[in-house]
Amino acid sequence: MLTNFTRSLAARSRRLSRQWLTVLLASVLALLFYGVVAPVLSRAESSQAKVFEQIWQTVNDNFYDPKFNGVDWQAMRQKYAPQATQARSPEALAVVVNQMLEELNVSHTRYYTSAEPEYYQLAGIFWQRGIQRQLKPFLPNGKLEYVGIGAYTRDVGGKTFIRAVLDGSPAARAGLKVGDQLLSVDGKPFQPIQSFAENADRPVKIQIQRTPDAAAQTIAVTPKRLDPTTMFLEAMKSSVEVIERGGKKIGYIHIWSYADDLYQRQLEQELSDRLSQVDGLVWDLRDGWGGAEPSYLNPFTAPALNITFTNRNGTKGRFDLPWKKPVVMLVNQGSRSGKEILAYGFRQFRVGKIVGSKTAGALLAGRAYIMRDGSLLYLAVADVSVNGERLEGKGVAPDIDVPFTVPYAQGSDPQKDRAIAAVLEAIAKPDQS
């Protein structure tokens, strides 16, 4: 009996020891969490809170409207600061900040992190305008670039679709098309930066769906390092086409960005070179970035001088600038800012038809501000009117409206097709253009 009692007591002691050991381990883990992990989370919360405060203050000091478009800006700070403090990453903070900025209900006002192509593209636009010194410390080797494929995307109903492809880009060369649904990249969900960051000049497998009922297909694409200060000029050069229809030659050029006068110089060079012998022109201002100046209409509106060059052998060449042949402007909801000024003037001066869909109605003057963590705040700092008319929130409607649905478009471009037809109509009946 005593032996059994002793054994029972020993077993109970072992159970109690295991229970105490479990409690002890749990306590140690808790101490480790609060001693190591919790301070890290606390520092992250503190960092996000400081960035949030800097963003709020920058808007408070620089937003173009001292009445904040009717929004109680002080109240916005109280509303969103607690959420910002809980953000665990820059991307999570961006969600909160952009919800706050959207309360202002204006264009040219958004917050970007390095997880977005627009971050680099805007940095490229403002690179020579005062942000270079601020941003360089946050860039690998101080160099502004990102790895990508040159495709713009849009989320529709929880699915990601290609809405535009830069001419000459890796996406274009691989055969990706507007309307393709992006399913995965190397078996993982598509991310515009992360999916390609470690794959410069190395093929990746992008799984797409081209129609709603088609089987998925895989396309190999080789991402490359993109320089935001030059990528849009390269795409513009690659876009130039001479299209033959009905015995006529139609020139085509796509201006992806107008945020520097170098794009206008390139346009004028193309008009006097590769496009000099065409019978009419499609001037595509869809998507990309704005920044255009009213003077960019001059090639199509100013009085023309006809200059003829005669070589020794008698061959002749003509140089006509400004342009006197029919021209059609192509716009859509991605045509914004300065491009909308061009569309407005194009109509006012009766240069030609505007084809496509209504422009963005995003006409304010924006400026880039670099935050303490290297993120970028794009902020509206001045109101803009054209001939006394505000286009912000209104946009410019086309003369010929051509609806276009992105999902599963299979690379079709009915807007471009209609613009070409409009040029042919203007050639046939020049007085009615």
Stretch-by-stretch model annotation:
Residues I55, M100, A151, A171, ...:
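Terminal peptide-recognition signature
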Residues M1-L16:
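N-terminal secretory signal peptides that target proteins for export/translocation
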Residues F68-G157, D213-S239, P430-D431:
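Extended, small/polar residue-biased N-terminal targeting/export presequences
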Residues Q86-A92, A172, L176-A214, E268, ...:
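PDZ domains, with a preference for the canonical peptide-binding region formed by the helix
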Residues A171-I193, V282-W283, F346-F349, I354-G356, ...:
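Conserved PDZ fold ligand-binding element
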Residues V23-G35:
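Bacterial N-terminal signal peptides
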Residues A200-R372:
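Cleft-lining beta-strand/loop regions that shape enzyme active-site pockets
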Residues R133, P140-Q191:
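PDZ/PDZ-like domain segments forming the peptide/carboxylate-binding groove
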